[in-house]
């Protein structure tokens, strides 16, 4: 290769005095423009030269050889074709290129092949991208079409609504005679169109053009300077004066049609409503729910009537009321029926509908076990008989060997294999309520009578309870193993109370048994099963449970516990239950054997855990569907309970006998007590016994009575009223005992109810006023009256009867009238002070603070004895 150097070639060199630069292609200059009114403006003018690629040409081409611009433009835009052979050397450069070798050719061929492969790969990628873009565009197109369809449907709906509104307006106008007047045809007038203003020149010469019309050039790097086109100014709004004017042009213009405002449409609607209200309205008959008491305003709202009309009707009946007054259900029903409405009477007690006594389906009824209550007099062997049947020993666990709770047990008959539920009731006089409760929930009563004791008062009471409950009886004549037993005497005594056994021609079954020797127990169970078969006891076990609370207590570790006898349905863990004013969810079920069970069927006694508070014994238990229903029932019952308590303690005027009894209780002394018991039944018995102790002078005042242990709040209450605390089979906790000791509050514990009643009776007897008894000592007659200076008047007397003692009480009697009562201060015989003067002797006597004594008066001497009373 030969390198040649021409003298005309420019050299590229690096020197310390010069920089590496390119020649500028743009020449700049300034031009001053002159405008009217003496204004001038200096404008920068650029002169841009054409950039040439290649060698320097000696001079510009002649005009004849140059091609037009339109012919050169496509050639300039077309891309240069790839040369298969190397390009020829530039003319005049003096460079000679060598020929390519075979290796270079093959390398270039492989490079071209690789370029083709890459181009093909890029083409496939571009096609895939185009296909993906097309699919995306298709989805977007479908979405746009769906949106367009929804928009059209919405427009169609709006159009239909507008059409319906327009038809309604036309119909309203037609009904009320408000037809719109047709607009008068517009007069055809010839208008002269204004000549368009002359167009402003786009550009002016440099010597006379306006500065605002001169185009501005924006130079961007790499491109020519382009003029910037200013945006067209927005049309100015018409002046405020001309905006409200109605001209011929605006009237004929379709774009400036005035639409009706919302306010005018609202006013027009109000006018139409006003006209429509003048028409007579149709009477709407409603079903009005009327409770037991309702205000006039609420009644008017439920009838959709005016309260004034209701008050006017009441005035016609002679009653003056305000809208806030409460009227009874009968008056509200009368008013509603006169106004043409139907009445539905409801009461607050409706929340209890459907809880009990729901009729069962005959297909779901199944046989159930009998419930047997054991009743009788105290110490006649009721619990011992049950122990013999259950093969247990409950008597040894009872305090004092007497039953003070209701117990419920299940026994399996050895002959038939059927289960029998036994309920053991106390036989003492204090437990009347327990026996009555046991008789209500039972199917059969076993009356236990001791063969050596006969019929006793509680035996008669049990007979009356069984007759009141209308349940059959089986007479169990117990203790036949004793030598003094006389069963025939028992049968004879029962005849006096209209109980005739089979051996005497009656229908009552009697069995002679011995609980101690377990004699004839199988025969007793057989008679119970036979009697149950005759009763044909059946129930539905698949329905929600119903039962009765036999006993309730507050256990410190387990909370409120209720002994429940399930009578219908099945009670399960998790059921929501209601008993009296208490509710809860069943947390656990414990059988009579102490085992935890998941469910309890009909005639099964269980202990239920989960109540919010201990219910009262005798309350009926029911399972409800949800807690909301349970809260409704319990709130109603609690409200009724509060109302009954308020009515019993209120000062309302009653009969004359009640007023007299209230006057007697004014001066009565109260013995304040706080009583806590283990179960509800024992608490009832204690309260009943203490209530019977009260007299017109003293009575037990029960400040608080509850089930559970003695707490610190009980001690605080007792301190405020100076009361005593009695715990029956319960104990005080550590804090309560410490507080009672600190404040001097007496806490007494009892396990036998009779000991409790006796101690309270003695304490109440101490509040009674003692009885004063007078004992006559003797009489003395005044013979003479002496006046002694230091002593006063002294009466000289002779004792006519009995004796006279110094310090005794005396009465001065004059003409058979008592004129003074006092004490004898001085008793002298001759001049000596003596303690006593016998009959027939003379003595001198002086009274305390009294000196009006006369001859012939009689002095009566007596002694007053104080005798303590008891209840």
UniProtKB/Swiss-Prot annotation:
A GO CC term attached to the entry: cytosol
Keywords: Cytoplasm, GTP-binding, Initiation factor, Nucleotide-binding, Protein biosynthesis
Chain intervals for the UniProt region annotation (G2): 401-405
Residue span(s) of domain tr-type G: 367-538
Positions of the UniProt region annotated as Disordered: 1-242
InterPro entries hit by this protein: EF-G-like_DII (IPR053905), EFTu-like_2 (IPR004161), IF2_assoc_dom_bac (IPR013575), IF2_II (IPR044145), IF2_N (IPR006847), P-loop_NTPase (IPR027417), Small_GTP-bd (IPR005225), T_Tr_GTP-bd_dom (IPR000795)
SUPFAM superfamilies to which the protein is assigned, alphabetical: Initiation factor IF2/eIF5b, domain 3, P-loop containing nucleoside triphosphate hydrolases, Translation proteins
Residue ranges with Low complexity bias: 68-91, 182-206, 225-241
Compartments reported by the entry: Cytoplasm
Broad class of the protein's primary localization: cytoplasm
Highest taxon listed in the record's lineage: Bacteria
Region G5: start-end pairs: 514-516
Region (G1): 376-383
Pfam families, A to Z: EF-G_D2 (PF22042), GTP_EFTU (PF00009), GTP_EFTU_D2 (PF03144), IF-2 (PF11987), IF2_assoc (PF08364), IF2_N (PF04760)
PROSITE patterns per the UniProt record, alphabetical: G_TR_2 (PS51722), IF2 (PS01176)
G4 as annotated region, ranges: 478-481
Positions of region (G3): 424-427
Molecular function terms, GO-annotated: GTP binding; GTPase activity; guanosine tetraphosphate binding; translation initiation factor activity
Biased composition (Basic and acidic residues): 115-174
Family: Belongs to the TRAFAC class translation factor GTPase superfamily. Classic translation factor GTPase family. IF-2 subfamily.
Function field: One of the essential components for the initiation of protein synthesis. Protects formylmethionyl-tRNA from spontaneous hydrolysis and promotes its binding to the 30S ribosomal subunits. Also involved in the hydrolysis of GTP during the formation of the 70S ribosomal complex.
Record-given protein name: Translation initiation factor IF-2
Organism listed in the record: Nitrobacter winogradskyi (strain ATCC 25391 / DSM 10237 / CIP 104748 / NCIMB 11846 / Nb-255)
Recorded name of the encoding gene: infB
């Amino acid at each position: 290769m030969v390198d040649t150097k021409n003298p005309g070639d420019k050299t590229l060199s690096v020197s310390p005095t010069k920089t590496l630069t390119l020649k500028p292609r743009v020449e700049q200059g300034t031009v001053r423009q002159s405008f009217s009114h003496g204004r001038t403006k200096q404008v920068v003018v650029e002169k841009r030269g054409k950039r040439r690629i290649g060698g320097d040409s000696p001079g510009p081409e002649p005009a004849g050889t140059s091609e037009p611009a339109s012919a050169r433009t496509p050639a300039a835009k077309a891309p240069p074709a790839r040369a298969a052979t190397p390009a020829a050397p530039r003319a005049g450069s003096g460079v000679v290129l060598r020929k390519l070798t075979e290796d270079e050719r093959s390398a270039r061929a492989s490079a071209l092949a690789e370029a083709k492969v890459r181009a093909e790969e890029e083409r496939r990628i571009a096609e895939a991208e185009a296909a993906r873009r097309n699919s995306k565009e298709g989805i977007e197109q479908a979405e746009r079409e769906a949106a367009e369809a929804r928009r059209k449907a919405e427009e169609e709906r709006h159009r239909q609504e507008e059409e319906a509104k327009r038809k309604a307006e036309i119909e309203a106008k037609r009904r009320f005679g408000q037809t719109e007047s047709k607009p008068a045809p517009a007069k055809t007038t010839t208008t002269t169109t204004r000549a368009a203003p002359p167009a402003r020149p786009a550009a002016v010469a440099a010597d006379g053009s306006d500065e605002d019309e001169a185009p501005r050039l924006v130079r961007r790097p790499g491109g020519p300077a382009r003029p910037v086109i200013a945006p067209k100014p927005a049309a100015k709004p018409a002046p405020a004066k001309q905006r409200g004017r109605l001209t011929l042009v605006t009237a004929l213009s379709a774009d400036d049609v005035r639409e009706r405002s919302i306010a005018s449409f609202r006013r027009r609607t109000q006018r139409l409503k006003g006209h429509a209200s003048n028409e007579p309205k149709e009477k709407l008959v409603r079903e009005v729910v009327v409770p037991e008491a309702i205000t006039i305003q609420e009644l008017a709202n439920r009838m959709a009537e005016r309260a004034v009309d209701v008050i006017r009707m009441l005035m016609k009946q002679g009653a003056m009321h305000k809208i806030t007054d409460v009227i009874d259900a009968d008056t509200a029903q009368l008013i509603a029926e006169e106004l043409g409405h139907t009445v539905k009477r409801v009461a607050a007690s409706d929340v209890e509908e459907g809880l009990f006594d729901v009729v069962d389906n005959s297909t779901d009824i199944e046989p159930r076990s009998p419930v047997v209550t054991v009743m009788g007099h105290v110490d006649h062997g009721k619990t011992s008989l049950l122990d013999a049947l259950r093969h247990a020993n409950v008597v040894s666990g009872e305090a004092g060997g007497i039953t003070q709770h209701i117990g419920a047990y299940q026994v399996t008959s050895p002959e038939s294999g059927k289960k029998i539920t036994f309920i053991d009731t106390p036989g003492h006089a204090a437990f009347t309520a327990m026996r009555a409760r046991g008789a209500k929930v039972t199917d059969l009563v076993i009356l236990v009578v001791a063969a050596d004791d006969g019929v006793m008062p509680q035996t008669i009471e049990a007979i009356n309870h069984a007759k009141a409950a209308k349940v059959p009886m089986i007479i169990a004549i117990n203790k036949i193993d004793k030598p003094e037993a006389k069963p025939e005497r028992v049968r004879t005594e029962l005849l006096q109370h209209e109980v005739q056994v089979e051996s005497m021609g009656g229908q009552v079954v009697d069995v002679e048994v011995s609980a101690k020797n377990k004699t004839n127990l199988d025969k007793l169970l057989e008679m119970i099963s036979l009697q149950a078969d005759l009763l044909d006891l059946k129930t539905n076990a698949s329905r929600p449970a119903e039962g009765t609370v036999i006993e309730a207590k507050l256990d410190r570790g387990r909370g409120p516990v209720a002994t429940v006898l399930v009578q219908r349905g099945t009670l399960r863990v998790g059921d929501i239950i209601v008993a009296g004013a208490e509710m809860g969810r069943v947390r656990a079920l414990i059988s009579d054997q102490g085992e935890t069970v998941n469910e309890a069927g009909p005639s099964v006694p269980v202990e239920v855990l989960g109540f919010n508070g201990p219910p009262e014994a005798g309350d009926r238990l029911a399972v409800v569907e949800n807690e909301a229903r349970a809260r409704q029932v319990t709130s109603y019952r609690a409200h009724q309970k509060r109302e009954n308590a308020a009515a019993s303690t209120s000062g309302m005027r009653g009969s004359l006998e009640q007023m007299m009894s209230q006057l007697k209780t004014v001066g009565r002394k109260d013995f304040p007590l706080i009583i806590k018991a283990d179960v509800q039944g024992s608490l009832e018995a204690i309260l009943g016994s203490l209530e019977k102790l009260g007299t017109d002078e003293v009575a037990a005042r029960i400040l608080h009575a509850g089930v559970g242990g003695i707490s610190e709040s009980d001690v605080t209450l007792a301190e405020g009223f100076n009361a005593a605390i009695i715990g029956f089979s319960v104990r005080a906790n550590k804090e309560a005992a410490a507080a009672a000791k600190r404040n001097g509050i007496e806490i007494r514990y009892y396990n036998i109810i009779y000991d409790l009643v006796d101690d309270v009776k003695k304490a109440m007897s101490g509040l009674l006023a003692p009885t004063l008894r007078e004992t006559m000592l003797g009489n003395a007659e005044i013979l003479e009256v002496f006046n002694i200076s230091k002593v006063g008047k002294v009466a000289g007397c002779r004792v006519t009867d009995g004796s006279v003692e110094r310090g005794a009480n005396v009465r001065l009697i004059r003409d058979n009238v008592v004129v003074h009562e006092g004490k004898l201060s001085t008793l002298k015989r001759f001049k000596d002070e003596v303690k006593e003067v016998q009959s027939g002797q003379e003595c001198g006597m002086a009274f305390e603070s009294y000196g009006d004594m006369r001859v012939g008066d009689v002095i009566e001497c007596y002694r007053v004895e104080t005798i303590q009373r008891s209840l």
